[in-house]
């Protein structure tokens, strides 16, 4: 009898843990989903930029970074 009670308690505990984890997973999924819906334009732009940068050779990437640095310096000079 004591063994059956122990097994029952363990099964109930496992069920409660499973339910609480399922609730946590659902909340996390909704949170990520809401974040994506709010920021999908920026996410797509970031993925496009990452794809373009990933396809560049090292020399093209260095030129790209130099162009960005030059544009930043020109912007700083124009503010002065």
Swiss-Prot record:
The modification Leucine amide is found at residue 53. GO terms for biological process: defense response to bacterium. It comes from the Eukaryota. Its main location: secreted. Residues 55-80 form a propeptide. Pfam families: Styelin (PF17562). The modification 6'-bromotryptophan is found at residue 24. It is found in: Secreted. GO terms for cellular component: extracellular region. Keywords: Amidation, Antibiotic, Antimicrobial, Bromination, Secreted, Signal. Residues 1-22 form the signal peptide. Bactericidal against several Gram-positive and Gram-negative bacteria. This is Styelin-C.
